[in-house]
Amino acid sequence: MGYIIKTDDSARLRLGIQSRLYEQSSVDLISRAGTLRGRKILEVGCGSGAMTLHLARAAGPQGTVTAIDNSPAQLDASRELVTENGFENVNFFEGDINCLDHLDNLYDLVYCRMVLHHVADADHAIREMVRSVCPDGYLLCEEPVIHDGSFCFPPSEAIDEFIRILRSCFSVNGRDYNIAFRMESVIRNLGLQIEHSRLHHPLLNSRQDKLLYAMSLSDLAPQMIKNGIVDPSSASELHEKLVHLSNSETTMTWARMHSVLARKSNGTERHYSKA
Ligand SMILES: C[S@@+](CC[C@H](N)C(=O)[O-])C[C@H]1O[C@@H](n2cnc3c(N)ncnc32)[C@H](O)[C@@H]1O
């Protein structure tokens, strides 16, 4: 089963807003993952490359970033961005997070943002990433929280309805929308030491930021309609309500990201042998 969200230009616009909202916190967490200059970094599900740039900068010219995604279109966008910005230390591969054993190296940092909730077996994906971390290296996973509907003040029925159908869509497609909160215990049970755990709630201040929910609905609507979760006219009615909400100056909305930075000590190996 493939990626259930569109990966075209409109989806990239939405990803651009999300990246901007989370960028500062993500860069701060990367800076906590030891000295990365001259080191090997693996980014899984690099998308259109927003974080690939920061990772390439952190590794420096003597270090390398291996960026993997299972979408050729996303890899093309990411490659273009990295080249435009003059980085020559990034290697791109088309590949699946569930199958990282073809990689020859172990990495000082394995980084993965907003990918695990798209994967059919997120626990297996985490095991694969843990196996790719070198002794004393780090794993940094960041996942958006779509656990409940509390993303708005005053409360909005449209946001609640959107979160309800979003969760249905992930469930019907066998995705774990609770992985943002589960991943910390999964990582700990694989023997890694949790060094930092953060729940970040950036506010969506401008009209364009507040459009995030309407944009997400547009990107997911074809899959939701295909799965019978919503009919086309209800989807377009809900879309209108979400656009309307983004125009309101008195409504506050926000997004959430849970991030876990974990370290693998030398004794970790016995816990994560392949299942
Ligand atoms: C929401 S985007 C996040 C992109 C990027 N990590 C960021 O934070 O901007 C999710 C990315 O994961 C990729 N992806 C989804 N399932 C994957 C899988 N099984 N293996 C590798 N990449 C996957 C998608 O193609 C998409 O580029």
Predicted features, each with a name:
Residues 20-40, 54:
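Conserved alpha-helix/loop element of class I SAM-dependent methyltransferases that forms part
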Residues 108-122:
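A short SAM/SAH-binding and catalytic strip from SAM-dependent methyltransferases
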Residues 42, 48-100:
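Class I SAM-dependent methyltransferase SAM/SAH-binding core
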Residues 123-138:
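A short glycine-rich, Lys/Arg-flanked "PGG" loop and its adjoining helix->strand segment in the class I
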Residues 140-208, 223:
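Conserved catalytic/acceptor-binding region of the Class I
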Residues 101-109:
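A short acidic, Gly/Pro-enriched loop at the edge of an enzyme's catalytic core
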Residues 2-22:
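Class I SAM-dependent methyltransferase Rossmann-like catalytic core
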Residues 178, 195-275:
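Conserved Class I S-adenosyl-L-methionine
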